[in-house]
């Protein structure tokens, strides 16, 4: 391809896997297929835009026609890293190989960890389950104020959060507790991606979070393609939870989002900006609201809604743009339990520059091929890991 692209847009449909990975059994996953099982469950998905790009050319999905002339280059990617969580998937997409998986705790944290927190702080722990912060604050806030017990909770991600009223646990004490939790969860058996202090104020029935949230994250252990872009003077616009996933490393602008549809609004607004570099969008609702909650109908509706917004995206793309749509892991809502599933992820690569449409790319053996392609496009330092497919885009 003679000219490089001025802008590359990476869209991660969080948890939208496309079929069981060869090593799924090692992760306790059998016959998992996020996209396929959702489509079967609802009697077929109505996603004409993804269909035109070539989604069903990767493998047939009920309700989505195989494109005779797909607009995009298409294949699927296999995760090489030893994990199936959000951080592992995204870090690998940007050129890292993760040997030790981050841990998630869908049933709450083990007694040993809770005991360490209680012994260190002299405070009891209440909660200890996956929950939305506002819900658990409403549920346990009054008990916390009366007893001084710490509200500890998690989410679908590798995270330990501690909520406390600022009049009950002073901020400095809360931060010290979180620093202690960070120190004891850096390695196995806990290996948590993030500890978050969640202070709040107010009276029972009217508790509100304060802006004094503090995150104790893990930074990527090596520079990623995002760092290479930033160091090379390129823009890296992170939309959604991308900046959190990378602890702000390699990000030149961060835009928070409230939902998938807000994420698409923000992304479409970014397409109107004049920039030279990468936009990187994560759409988390698929995973957080529907995958973990095992809600295939809700998941299907969200996929259809996403497809509807692609019309606006396609209208704004020029020959200087490259759009890459993928995922970071699976989360089959028809499967048992509440955890992610080890799957291939789709890869669709489109530009209006492809006058003859796209064709099949070879199967990618690591998500890092995507990051290598971005680095190759912008002539910045290539990651140690991953093989560019830029030359295959004609």
From Swiss-Prot:
Q: Is Ion transport set as a keyword in this record?
A: no
Query: Which residues does Mn(2+) 2 bind?
Result: 287, 292, 340
E.C. number = 5.4.2.7
Residues annotated as binding Mn(2+) 1 are: 14, 328-329
What subcellular locations does the record give?
Answer: Cytoplasm
User: Which HAMAP family does the record associate with it?
Assistant: Phosphopentomut (MF_00740)
Q: What is the protein name given in its UniProt record? A: Phosphopentomutase
Species name: Listeria welshimeri serovar 6b (strain ATCC 35897 / DSM 20650 / CCUG 15529 / CIP 8149 / NCTC 11857 / SLCC 5334 / V8)
Instruction: List the gene name.
Output: deoB
């Amino acid at each position: 391809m003679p000219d490089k692209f001025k802008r590359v847009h990476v869209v991660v449909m969080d948890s939208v896997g496309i079929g069981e990975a060869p090593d799924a059994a090692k992760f306790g996953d059998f016959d998992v297929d996020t996209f396929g099982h959702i489509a079967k469950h609802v009697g077929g998905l109505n996603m004409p835009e993804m269909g035109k790009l070539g989604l069903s050319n990767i493998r047939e999905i009920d309700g989505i026609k195989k494109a005779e002339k797909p607009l995009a280059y298409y294949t699927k990617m296999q995760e090489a890293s030893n994990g199936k969580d959000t951080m592992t998937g995204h870090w690998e997409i940007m050129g890292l190989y993760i040997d030790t998986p981050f841990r998630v705790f869908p049933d709450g944290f083990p007694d040993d960890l809770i005991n360490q927190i209680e012994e260190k702080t002299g405070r009891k722990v209440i909660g200890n389950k996956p929950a939305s912060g506002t819900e658990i604050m409403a549920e346990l806030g009054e008990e916390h104020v009366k007893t001084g017990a710490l509200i500890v909770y998690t989410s679908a991600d590798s995270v330990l959060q501690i909520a406390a009223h600022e009049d009950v646990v002073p901020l400095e004490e809360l931060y010290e507790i979180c620093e202690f939790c960070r120190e004891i969860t850096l390695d196995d058996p806990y290996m948590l991606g993030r500890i978050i202090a969640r202070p709040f104020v107010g009276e029972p029935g009217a508790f509100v979070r304060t802006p004094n949230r503090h995150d104790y994250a893990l930074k990527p252990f090596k520079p990623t393609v995002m760092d290479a872009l930033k160091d090379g003077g390129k823009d890296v616009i992170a939309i959604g939870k991308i900046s959190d996933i990378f602890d702000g490393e390699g990000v030149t602008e961060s835009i928070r989002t409230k939902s998938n549809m807000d994420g698409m609004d923000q992304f479409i607004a970014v397409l109107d900006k004049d920039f030279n570099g990468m936009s990187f969008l994560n759409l988390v609702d698929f995973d957080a609201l529907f995958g973990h909650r095992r809600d295939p109908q809700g998941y299907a509706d969200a996929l259809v809604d996403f497809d509807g917004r692609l019309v606006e995206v396609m209208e704004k793309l020029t020959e200087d743009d490259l759009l890459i749509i993928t995922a970071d892991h699976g989360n089959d809502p028809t499967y048992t339990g509440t955890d992610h599933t080890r799957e291939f992820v789709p890869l669709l690569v489109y530009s209006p520059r492809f006058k003859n449409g796209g064709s099949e790319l070879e199967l990618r053996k690591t998500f890092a091929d995507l990051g290598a392609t971005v680095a190759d496009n912008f002539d910045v330092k290539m990651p140690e890991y991953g093989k560019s497919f830029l030359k295959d885009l004609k």
